[in-house]
Amino acid sequence: MHTLEQLRAGELLGARHLKLAENLTVFPPEIFSLKETLEVLDLTGNQLSRLPDELAEFKKLRILFCSENRFTELPEVLGRCRLLTMVGFKANRIATVSAASLPAGLRWLILTDNVIERLPDELGQCAALQKLMLSGNRLTALPDTLANCHRLELLRIAANRLEALPEWLLGLPRLAWLAYAGNPFSDEKERQLGETAAAAEIPWQALTLGEQLGQGASGVIHSAVLRSDEGTQGVAVKLFKGAVTSDGLPRCEMAVSLAAGRHPNLIGVAGRVSDHPSGMPTLVMTLIDPGFVNLAGPPSLDSCTRDVYPTDLTFTPNALMAMVQGVAAAARHLHERGILHGDLYAHNLLHSLLHSVQEQGRVLLGDFGAASCYDGADRERAARLERLEVRAFGCLLEELLARCHPNDEALGALHSLAEECLLAAVLQRPSFAEIAARIDAVAATMVVEPVCA
């Protein structure tokens, strides 16, 4: 975080990154002292409602964040910023998005939690668009021209007013991460899914909260002790914030978490709390052994849609096999229940650091914030939706193979599988049932070895 005082004192001359949050109501003219060098400008958390036309004079500006301000329209000056590729205006009051406001090189657009009812057809001309985040608006339709965005990989359209999921969307060649829960077209299926969930009701007074374990967009997770007639046990408790997130609505996440059921490669759910003193939706989950850690970090500003791994992270072939077997099994389990995870990424996987043969490479898939449900009886549509997630698995498999040592001929079949999962023709990709069978066939040819590379 920087300050206006630093800017005025000349302490930030030549800066490439600037982050200001000082309850600003106007764009500080002092920022223009950086127009020759500034690449990333973050004005999140102010009271701004407009940007100056002179913003187009910034010669190197690539990334602009103006979330949590008071904009009612996406500023048209953005369209004149020739190097701008990433634009974030989450949680404003934006109702209008004009064609003129869209930068030619746009890769990543965040308009979550606004009041947008329609988008311009010209959005489909943004050929470089990879990531589009529109959850929590008032959209009743998407521009059909988005079918031209062949590089689009991640799409968030949850919590809108969409009456149907466009057919062209399911044919986008690179789309891998999709969230659409909380729309009229999915409401009935979500209600049915919630009714089938066999979840224990856990009294709030039976829980004693401990330390905070983590915090995400949708809620805060604490360790806790659960008391019952059988004794006490350690659990994890997620307290949902209740607001719309970049992925969707917390109520949808909670419903899917309960409906997902038990699986050895999913983070287990013990039940829900319906009597929280503040009415806060609360989920009680299995407490994960500290020997499990996140497999990767989320995408960076530069990687856009690809996770960031520790530079020294490597896996043995046996550890890799255990991981991809576990992920494929978990995804297949969800698809059999009509659930699309929507965020099948390494950063949502916990993997075991334990070196025992029983635990080597074991993974747990969590975070249902982007999950959606679908009707498995509609086989053609279900197959298309499922194979979007197959592409996400292909990206993950490709990333893991790149970090596997030794990466010998025994893994050749997995390289071929990754290529098939990434095919541009959606229905030519294998199903998770096929994927699981092929991975098992490779695993059967391998011998047990130490997990450390």
Predicted regions and their residues:
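Catalytic-loop of the protein kinase fold
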Residues: 331, 335-352
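ATP-binding glycine-rich loop module of kinase domains
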Residues: 220-255
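The feature captures the LRR N-terminal capping module
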Residues: 1-53, 57-110, 118-121, 176-217, ...
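Structural motif at the C-terminus of the N-lobe alphaC helix and the adjacent alphaC-beta4 loop
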Residues: 255-266
